[in-house]
A protein has these predicted regions:
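Hydrophobic transmembrane alpha-helices and their immediate loop junctions
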Residues: 1-199
Length: 199
């Protein structure tokens, strides 16, 4: 029972870290791109607001953490593109780093074999790295859906505002497809196969 609770806690901690990290990277890029904004309110720095309870439940059930995005009011196409790309790149960096740690075996981590360790406390870091890999792959796949508030929506808004308007009109249908994909566990299946392929 301790092992199950430990694994659930580690999964929730990894999901919360990814949600906060993903949104904070976008916040730094926004501050860099919008240098004319002198006074930045404290609301974006309250990082616990980025942790979504539904996203935590989805991270436990489907390995797809969804963070509450901070809604940037951006009219500049270049800033929209930079925000979307920053979100995608941040998730790719976490995915590549955790897969590299799993593949190269840093810190006693040897691939996906964490249950052979003699004591449960020795398994904390390997389980954390595995969940970071799985959850970042799931969050990356989710953010590549053309939903207006996700990273792909920001990229489309940066490339073509007319296409973004069309995407907003079809947002309900795309969200329905996204929910079906998450419920059918297709993102988790694809993410786990991708990670096993890299290992």
């Amino acid at each position: 029972m301790k092992e199950i609770l430990l694994e659930l806690g580690i999964c929730l901690a990894a999901a919360a870290f990814l949600m906060i990290y993903h949104e904070c990277v976008r916040l730094f890029v926004y501050m860099f791109c919008q240098k004319s904004v002198k006074c930045f309110r404290t609301a974006p720095w309250k990082v616990w607001r980025y942790i979504d309870p539904v996203g935590l439940i989805l991270s436990l059930t489907s390995m797809v953490p969804i963070s509450k995005p901070y809604f940037f009011r951006v009219r500049d196409r270049r800033t929209n593109l930079c925000l979307g790309m920053a979100g995608v790149v941040s998730l790719v960096v976490v995915l590549a780093g955790s897969v590299a740690v799993l593949r190269l075996g840093y810190g006693g981590i040897d691939g996906l074999d964490h249950l052979v360790l003699p004591h449960w406390w020795n398994a904390i870091v390997p389980i954390l790295v595995q969940y970071l890999a799985l959850l970042s792959a799931g969050m990356l796949a989710a953010n590549l859906f053309p939903i207006s508030t996700f990273d792909m929506g920001m990229i489309v808004a940066g490339v073509s505002p007319a296409a973004y308007l069309g995407m907003i009109k079809a947002d309900g249908i795309v969200k329905l497809i996204f929910v079906l994909v998450v419920l059918l566990d297709m993102i988790h299946y694809g993410a786990s196969r991708l990670i096993v392929l890299f290992l």
